[in-house]
Swiss-Prot record:
Sorted UniProt keywords: Aminoacyl-tRNA synthetase, ATP-binding, Cytoplasm, Ligase, Nucleotide-binding, Protein biosynthesis
Protein encoded by which gene: trpS
EC top class, as a word: ligase
One GO MF term: tryptophan-tRNA ligase activity
Motif ('HIGH' region): 20-29
Protein name: Tryptophan--tRNA ligase
InterPro entries listed in its UniProt record: aa-tRNA-synth_I_CS, aa-tRNA-synth_Ic, Rossmann-like_a/b/a_fold, Trp-tRNA-ligase, Trp-tRNA-ligase_bac-type, Trp-tRNA_synthetase
Length: 335
């Protein structure tokens, strides 16, 4: 069964996505988003978007972005996003995202966009910032509302953006009549932290590479990064983000990878040294990442296969998106 055979049915829609600005996914991406999204594919109509338009808020090398998009697509598929179950599409291939973003930009007030915390944080750190960064949440709202998304997986850093989406949907509905489904947050409580600085999220742009487990890391790298991860001097395995952030981070990783609860993991390692947990976690991570890396490399050996998946899925996404645009334009009187 190929992506062209996916049947849009009455299941609730879940939309998620990832920016391909970096060609490397890390453990935070996998445990915080991809793993749980993969499990939704049988119970929901799932759209997974490679958000390359969002990547343009900061300058990109065109060839690098093009290559990274294929690499990220391969890693997502290898990590469990099944193109036979999900519509895995390229944002830029669905022009209706920009059409609806213009409409929503005229529903959103300047003050609402300016209050977005992520914009204020990033604009405070950068010199010359683009208007695209300012309107990023409006494009995100368009991404979500185009497909009548019932649920959107969000982390803490995106909750404000989703709330703006909900506000814009309700405002449009109030003014023009029922048009948009108001999406609900599917809160992602899993948060993976930097191995060397467990006060901050694991990131592709960490201060040091040793703080991040990339899904394509070699087994040796994975073992070294875990064994050298920051803990504390107590050598007592427990979960407490305030007093034991380092070991708590490792406990969460182990729990997510083994489907144990936090409490179960703490009980398993009660009375054991940190080195035992680190060794076991390293073994599990090596197995998981090696499987993903092997499948990624197989996919990258035939990039045309990946492109075909994206082209086919994007065509299907355009068909769904156009129905929304038709509905919106009719309400606005521009059809």
């Amino acid at each position: 069964m190929t992506s062209s055979a996916i049947r849009i049915n009455k299941k609730p829609v879940v939309l998620s996505g990832i920016q391909p600005s970096s060609g490397m996914l890390h453990l935070g991406n996998y445990l915080g988003a991809l793993k749980s999204f993969g499990r939704m594919q049988d119970d929901y109509t799932t759209y997974f978007m490679l958000a390359n338009l969002h990547s343009m808020t900061f300058p990109q090398n065109p060839e690098v972005l093009r290559e990274n998009t294929i690499r990220i697509a391969a890693q997502c598929i290898a990590a469990g996003i099944d193109p036979a179950k999900s519509i895995v599409f390229l944002q830029s291939d669905v022009y209706q995202h920009n059409q609806l973003a213009w409409v929503l930009g005229n529903v959103c007030t300047f003050g609402e966009a300016a209050r977005m915390t992520q914009f204020k944080d990033k604009s405070g750190k950068q010199g010359n910032i683009s208007t695209g960064l300012f309107t990023y949440p409006i494009l995100m709202a368009s991404d979500i509302l185009l497909y009548d998304s019932a649920f959107v997986p969000v982390g803490a850093d995106q909750k404000q953006h989703l709330e703006l989406t909900r506000t814009l949907a309700r405002r449009f509905n109030a003014q023009y009549g029922q048009t948009f489904l108001v999406p609900q947050p599917f809160e992602c409580s899993i948060r993976i932290y930097d191995l060397q600085d467990p006060a901050v999220k694991m990131s592709k742009s960490s201060a040091t590479e040793s703080g991040t487990i990339f899904l394509l890391d070699s087994p040796d790298k994975i073992v070294k990064k875990i064994m050298r991860s920051v803990t504390d001097s107590e050598d007592v395995i427990g979960y407490d983000r305030e007093t034991k952030p380092g070991v708590s981070n490792l406990v969460v990783m182990y729990s997510c990878l083994t489907d144990c609860t936090i409490e179960q993991t703490v009980n398993i390692y009660s009375g054991k040294k940190y080195s035992v947990l680190k060794k076991d976690l390293s073994d599990i991570l090596v197995e998981v990442c090696t499987t993903i890396a092997t499948r990624t490399n197989e996919l990258l050996d035939d990039k045309n296969y990946i492109r075909k998946i994206l082209v086919t899925a994007s065509e299907q996404a355009r068909g769904v998106a156009q129905k929304t645009i038709d509905r919106v334009y009719e309400k606005l009187g521009v059809y």
